[in-house]
Amino acid sequence: MQVLVALAALSSLAAPVVGFSIPRGVPVSQSMIDVKLSSAGNSMVKATITNNGDRALNLLKFHTIMDSNPTRKVSIESQDGKEVQFTGMMPRYKNTDLKPTYFMSLPPKGTVEHSFDIAATHDLSRGGQFTLKAEGMVPIAEENSTNITGAAQYHSNELHMTIDGDQAASVKSAIGVAKRDGPFTRIDKRTKIDMQSCGNRQELQALTAALSASAKLSSMSAQAVGQNQQKYMEYFKDPKYAKTVQSRFQAVAKESSSTNNGGTTYFCSDVMGGCEEGVLAYTLPSRNQVYNCPIYYSELPPLTKECHAQDQATTTLHELTHNPAVQEPFCEDNGYGYERATALSAEKAVQNADSYALFANAVYVGC
């Protein structure tokens, strides 16, 4: 891994489509909300979300089709059946102390529209015909509440679009040029870190410690895959994927331990401007880059001893699984938090970033 440290002060600006952390035992509705996709221009998509119920709902926007961040809101296939490369961000959100601004209120039988340009987060420069669809789970709270009481699954219609490649290529990328107010210094050896290259010594120390802890947790987890079948089955469901899971943990351990030979670049600050409120860290898988956000340092402990909780070490581990340079295919955000992650099918779990972070936490804490 290559760690780059920005001299600039941290900037704070405002994923695949998945559910957030759902408390154990809460109901999941198959038909509470409806999502319909329609074309709104060359590469513009309009999602119409309808509350089919008879009571108002607060819908958590994180990791859903309503997310304001440039996450993967829809899956896109070209006319030859190949998945279109995603060029947006995969954020990890803080899953506690949810604020009212993280939610969207929807009255009974009410409808809200959310439009987004898929060319801002996908390479559509070839143009042609594309097929889009959206599916996922939206955590829900009662009206005027942020207490998650249930979840609503959704499966949209298939939308077929004919896109002009040149016009799509002219759309500005949602994650663009790094916002650098000063030069970067590459850290070639952790034992020889130039502390003057970082504007905040404490943050650099925290990141370095998190990488070290990520390496240790990943190594422990790789061993646990073969030694603790009960725990493995809790998270990954099928023993036929054990070698894949073990291999990914070993790859993350190697990447976390590397100083200048890894395939990823890890930034201790948000030079790309992707840290909206609630984002702990995020990955740009198309670039194999990871960025920490201010609350990664201010609101996460280095290494928690609480089951299913978030910390700096497992957040770093989580983000590294999103990078194709670590292991391909890279992990998605199929299920967020313990309840959703452990409810996934084996096929989804083995490609879910939080399943690896939560398993590592469970192995370390002894959950």
From Swiss-Prot:
Any one annotated GO CC term: extracellular region
Protein role: Probable secreted metalloprotease that shows high activities on basic nuclear substrates such as histone and protamine. May be involved in virulence.
Entry keywords, A to Z: Cleavage on pair of basic residues, Disulfide bond, Hydrolase, Metal-binding, Metalloprotease, Protease, Secreted, Signal, Virulence, Zinc, Zymogen
SUPFAM superfamilies for the chain: Metalloproteases ('zincins'), catalytic domain
Lineage, broadest ranks: Eukaryota, Fungi, Dikarya, Ascomycota, Pezizomycotina
Cofactors that this protein relies on: Zn(2+)
Catalytic activity: Preferential cleavage of bonds with hydrophobic residues in P1'. Also 3-Asn-|-Gln-4 and 8-Gly-|-Ser-9 bonds in insulin B chain
Example GO BP: proteolysis
Coiled-coil segments: none
Record localization: Secreted
Protein name: Probable neutral protease 2 homolog MCYG_00239
Main location: secreted
Enzyme Commission code(s) on record: 3.4.24.39
Cysteines joined through disulfide linkages: C198-C268, C275-C293, C307-C367
Residues spanning the signal sequence: 1-19
Binding site for Zn(2+): H318, H322, D333
GO MF term set: metal ion binding; metalloendopeptidase activity
Organism: Arthroderma otae (strain ATCC MYA-4605 / CBS 113480)
